[in-house]
Regions:
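TM-loop-TM module centered on a large, flexible mid-protein loop between adjacent transmembrane helices
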Residues: 92, 124-128, 196, 243-311, ...
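Membrane-interface "cap" regions at the ends of multi-pass membrane proteins
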Residues: 1-51, 64-68, 76-80, 88-89, ...
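C-terminal membrane-solvent junction of multi-pass transporters and transport-like membrane proteins
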Residues: 160, 333-343, 381-434
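Small/aliphatic-rich secondary-structure junction motif
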Residues: 481-539
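Helix-loop-helix junctions that connect adjacent transmembrane segments
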Residues: 11-15, 132, 163-239, 243-296
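Extracellular loop-to-transmembrane helix junctions
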Residues: 17, 39-142, 247-251, 257
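Membrane-interface loop-to-helix entry segments
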Residues: 135-188, 244-248, 370-384, 439-453
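A generic transmembrane alpha-helix motif of multi-pass inner-membrane proteins
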Residues: 372-377, 409-467
Length: 545
């Protein structure tokens, strides 16, 4: 098998409708990225201590670099698949699979970590116990519920996401303004924003601060969700960059503001230990005013937005696996549809089970999930940046409706954006820090990637396709195409010697679970009566049947 381009012909049954505008995309993007602060703030404070706002700000700058890369690539290739699609155009199917498989781990962890963050917030409403058994058991129940909802065909509602995003933003703005006016002590906060200063309260070492910044990257994961919806976006060249700019601007302000006012009412040590699983509710519960009703309120909106984020992760798994399946990167069973509900039940079940297993393996530790989350997310982001740089160099004349700014010129035609270069280096360093310092996240992440590559190679060999080729899908459009449903197939037994016709009938029967009826017709000459005995021909017919 040579690593050459190959072509496969597919029947184009239906195009995704382009119905989403910039507001709907913003709602989806904010729902995925904005939900992360409800668990990422605690793990960031655990390491960055008093420098938590700085860590979030630095991670936010890297997020801007990544967001601009996705804005350019998603408008250049407005197709589902995200970084897997970008890598396919920039490299080949093998690199595309590695990027997509890492992204799939990211989606599975979105399901797991978002669902895992819900029970601690619900205790502010219902008073549930905070034991690991309740925490893990509640998470498994939530993921199971989401599986059945998606099995029956529940859709992601852009309007619900938009309303919830607005409620969350307004609630956080209220907290920042109220605490900023009544409680904020900036000289006190700034005095503790020191890094590597001995004998200073809340001053992390430089190594701790770097780990805290890496953890802060978790707060900005989820931008991939906008890229996944590129094929359903009206005017993607305008809507995608606009929604991404809105998302990154609002998140940077809110994240920095929440972290600053948070450290005005609670120590980073307490935030990273006692409230590591529910940092936002922990902050507002310490307010000298309104804490008794602010904590349940934030518990409610946190649970809702985290539930939507977890559900979006499960939907993202199915969208991504369907895109990869079209290019023969994963076996057909992963995107096989349920005969009744027309949903990818196998992939939904497999990924829901994997998410539950990961939660159980975490033993109730948010850090374990955050490390593994970073492992998959940074692989996806790294290949997105790398794909942009490679395509900018290989094909500078390619039509790009949106181009990342701050470019370094190379000759008259080529230019490379500084943001993509910075993003490439930063995401690789964060991924490397997980590999070096986080053995649990590293081991599980590497096992996931190795098993995926082995599956890919075996499947490609079975299909007699090149491992590193670049498969091209040629879609044939048929006006008013309607899918065929076969229940009964009639086979002329006189052509029983024609094995090709018989094999075709058997393959159709297997695909559609249809029955086959074989018929042997005996022609009677006009000169003979209809009931005339024709023993020899009847014997031949019986033999054929």
């Amino acid at each position: 098998m040579s690593d050459s381009s190959e072509r496969v012909v597919h029947l184009e049954k239906k195009n995704l409708k382009r119905t989403l505008g910039a507001l709907e995309l913003f709602a989806v993007g904010y729902g995925d990225v904005g939900s992360s602060i409800y668990y990422a703030l605690g793990v960031t404070a655990l390491y960055a201590l008093g420098a938590t706002p700085i860590a979030l700000l630095i991670a936010g700058l890297v997020f801007i670099c990544t967001a601009l890369t996705y804005a350019e690539m998603s408008t250049t290739f407005p197709e589902p698949g995200g970084t897997a699609t970008f890598s396919r155009y920039a490299f080949n199917d093998l690199v595309s699979f590695i990027a997509g498989w890492g992204l799939l781990l990211d989606y599975i962890l979105t399901v797991a970590i978002s669902a895992f963050a819900i029970p601690p917030y619900l205790k502010y409403i219902f008073g549930f116990p905070g034991t690991p058994f309740y925490h893990i058991g509640g998470t498994v129940i939530i993921i199971t519920l989401l599986f059945f909802l998606n099995l029956f065909g529940t859709k992601h509602s852009g309007r619900v996401s938009l309303i919830l995003a607005l409620i969350t933003i307004l609630s956080q703005v209220f907290v920042i303004l109220a605490a900023g006016i009544l409680l904020l002590n900036m000289p006190y906060i700034i005095s503790h924003m020191k890094i590597g200063v001995p004998n200073t309260d809340w001053s992390p070492s430089w190594w701790q601060f770097m780990k805290g910044t890496a953890m802060a990257m978790v707060a900005y994961t989820g931008i991939e969700s906008i890229a996944q919806l590129a094929a359903e976006t009206k005017k993607p060249a305008v809507s995608i960059p606009r929604s991404i700019k809105w998302t990154m601007s609002i998140l940077l302000v809110l994240y920095f503001g929440i972290s600053v006012v948070g450290l005005s009412v609670i120590s980073p040590v307490e935030l990273g230990t006692t409230y590591i699983d529910d940092p936002i509710a922990g902050i507002v519960s310490k307010f000298p005013f309104g804490g008794e009703w602010l904590a349940p309120w934030f518990g409610l909106i946190a649970a809702m937005i985290l539930l939507i984020a977890s559900n979006a992760g499960l939907i993202g798994c199915s969208r991504l696996i369907f895109s990869m399946g079209q290019y023969y990167q994963v076996p057909h069973m992963f995107y096989k549809l349920h005969p009744r509900f027309r949903t990818p039940h196998v992939s939904l079940a497999v990924f829901a089970v994997i998410a539950c297993v990961i939660v159980i393996l975490s033993k109730g530790e948010m850090l374990f999930l955050a490390d593994l989350y970073n492992f998959g997310a940074q692989i996806a982001f790294f290949f997105a940046h790398l794909s942009l740089l490679i395509l900018r160099w290989k094909d500078p004349a390619m039509k790009r409706p949106f181009k990342a700014p701050f470019n370094i010129p190379f000759g008259k035609k080529r230019s490379l954006p500084i943001t993509a270069i910075v993003g490439l280096i930063a995401t690789f360093c964060v991924w490397l820090s997980v590999v070096i310092t986080k053995p649990q996240g590293r081991n599980l992440g590497i096992i996931w990637m190795v098993l995926g590559v082995v599956m890919y190679l075996v499947y490609r060999r079975k299909k007699n396709l090149a491992y590193g080729g670049q498969l091209t899908i040629e879609k044939i459009k048929i006006p008013e195409y309607k899918p065929m449903h076969l229940k009964h197939i009639l086979v002329d037994a006189r052509t029983i010697g024609n094995t090709e016709a018989l094999q075709t009938a058997c393959q159709l029967a297997k695909s559609y679970k249809a029955k086959i009826t074989a018929v042997h017709v005996i022609e009677i000459p006009d000169s003979l009566p209809a009931d005339a005995p024709m023993l020899k021909r009847e014997e031949q017919g019986e033999g054929a049947l």
